Amino acid sequence: LNGRPATPRTVQEEIVMPGFANRIEDILASSTRRGLPRKLTHPQSDVAAYMKGVDNFCRVMAIRPGDHVVMLTDPLLDPRVIQAVQGLARGRGATFISYMGDSTRYVTIPDEAKALLERATFVVSTWFASVIDPFCMALRRNKGQRWVKITFFRDLDLLHTPQAQFPVELLGEIVRATGRLFPEKGDFLMRFTDPRGTDFRIPYSDAMLQKLKRHNRWRGQNTAEEDGCYVHYLPTHGPNLFEPGMVGLQPEEKIGIEGMIWAQWAVGFDKPFASPVGVEFRDDVVHAVHGEGFEAEVLRDYLIGGTLEEVGCGHVPKAPRFDIYPAGPNSPGALHFGINALQPSEYLRRVMPNWEEPHIHMDLVTYDSTVTAGNKPMIEDGYLLSLRDPAVRAMAERYGDPVDLLEAYPV
């Protein structure tokens, strides 16, 4: 950066891969655009399509006879979701109990819930703590508990949607194909660029790479069958191109994350950024927020000193392209840069008082990034290259037209 941030390009200068929506104009024109909470109505699908959604639900929730299922919930979760998990557990000869917290925003598990979790073999959770609390990680690692995070399954009617009905095996093959885009071994630099001037770099060691590749999510295991697993339902949010815990980093460990992210949008804002906003990292922390508009002021107010919690990459071709609420986009090649700040944002507390994420968090979003891992391209102008993998295309043939399944994004 040489002490100065790169100058962002204007919207008119953005480069777009023909036929794929990734520009600000595309976001603004989209009927599915959502950056703030609002109730969605999901039209009923036909019975054949609905059964595909039900089948995926039952397979991801891989409850075994004799399991003890604990569900961590919140007051805003559709009660039918709880009933669905309970019914599946009872139908498979498992026991079930649920615990309702005040919200989803716990970053650590409260003591009264720890006693319930200690007995569990299978956990379904809406809580943010599920992924970051060392207590939860230890339960998976030491007791082999299987966890399902349901950030994106808060309404039972989602079973009627194309994203819920997308073949879970095909999704796993897409993830494995993305995993094959990483180098096989050795240290490398993961680099993110885009037409606005983003130049963001994450150094990877071979140890980090091998740890990431062993994770069940990067092996395309999106059903909660393996002891110690952690999966998302609806599958899949991510998996993350970078996540400190997933690559074996210890808290406060620094690896030299540097550079500038000129995001197009962020969770908590109704529309994409009206003027350029750049978040600059130096030595693994947010050093500055560049820009003159309202959005830049909001981010500058609380992100300075924050750290990178994740870089998530969407993998679900039938996820609504421009729905980024509550935790970033799930559409292929769309990225969210998750940053945890040192203090909560008053702005986010005002506009999203019941947000599913803690108010210290921020997901910056890009749809047109180019990502390289060493000298290997992974994403080009927002297009996830694993969608063209021969194994992915061959598997897609089993389920229908590969072009429709893999590249007809709902916008």
Give the positions of each predicted feature:
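Short loop/turn microsegments at loop-to-beta-strand junctions
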Residues: 274-276, 366-367
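Short, Lys/Arg-enriched N-terminal segments with co-localized hydrophobic residues
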Residues: 1-16
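Dual-mode signal for accessory low-complexity, basic/Gly-rich regions
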Residues: 272, 288-351, 401-409
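Internal helix-turn-beta structural module
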Residues: 324, 331-401
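Conserved active-site beta-strand-loop modules that form the wall/rim of enzyme catalytic pockets
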Residues: 275-279, 285-288
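Active-site bordering "gate/hinge" segments
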Residues: 13-260, 265-270, 274, 282, ...
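A generic structural signal for short, non-catalytic loop/turn and secondary-structure boundary residues
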Residues: 183, 195, 254-256, 304-306, ...
